[in-house]
């Protein structure tokens, strides 16, 4: 999950100064910065009226994390200023479905190891006007939905099972192309936008785990464990 550089941890009870003047500066020079999580891809595809796989193919770039080669997607950028592909002048053309990274800015949130959340405030941009005081808890209430929280919980739970299996296969297989394709298909692509997201996300995680276990068992049968 994307973490904003140059940030400081804050508590829900804290207050910070921030005011958005819709200058769109935070939408420029964002190459590789706006990570698209499965939930983001689903809602953006639904908003645009296209399939989820078409959204990823048309509007994102895939990167493989160093060492483990786990696939992640980020929004494409355009122009010399490497602006978000959805920036139209100074306005977001997908405002109602914009990614969580954008919705939460200048904050970012991640799960802690106790089932709660860590909250951070970006200090990286000097163009932020020193506006009125913002209560952290109010910002989270308005921008961090219950489905976001449920997604965090399921993602953390699922990856605790999937990551060890993926790491085993990544080390054993000579060619990881098929492995990476399975991650992309089940984790990112396999959604119907006329069905609820979370039930599909949970199903896909279960199926992906079973599929990785099947490959491990097949590999063990062939080469020995």
Name the predicted role of every residue range.
Residues 1-225:
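Short loop/turn segments that flank or connect secondary-structure elements
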């Amino acid at each position: 999950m994307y973490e904003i550089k140059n940030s400081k941890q804050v508590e829900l009870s804290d207050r910070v100064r921030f005011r958005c003047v819709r200058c769109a500066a935070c939408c420029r020079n964002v190459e590789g910065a706006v990570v698209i999580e499965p939930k983001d891809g689903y809602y953006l595809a639904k908003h645009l009226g296209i399939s989820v796989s078409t959204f990823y193919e048309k509007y994102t770039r895939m990167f493989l994390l160093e060492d483990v080669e786990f696939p992640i997607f980020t929004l494409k950028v355009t122009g010399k200023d490497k602006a978000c592909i959805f920036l139209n002048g100074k306005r977001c053309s997908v405002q109602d479905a914009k990614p969580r990274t954008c919705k939460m800015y200048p904050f970012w949130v991640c799960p802690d190891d106790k089932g709660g959340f860590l909250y951070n405030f970006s200090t990286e941009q000097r163009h932020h006007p020193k506006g009125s005081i913002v209560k952290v808890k109010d910002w989270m209430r308005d921008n961090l939905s219950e489905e976001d929280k449920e997604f965090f919980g399921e993602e953390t739970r699922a990856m605790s099972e999937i990551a060890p299996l993926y790491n085993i296969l990544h080390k054993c297989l000579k060619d990881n192309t098929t492995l990476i394709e399975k991650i992309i298909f089940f984790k990112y692509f396999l959604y119907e936008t006329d069905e609820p997201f979370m039930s599909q996300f949970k199903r896909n995680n279960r199926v992906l785990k079973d599929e990785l276990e099947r490959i491990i068992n097949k590999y063990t049968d062939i080469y020995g464990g």
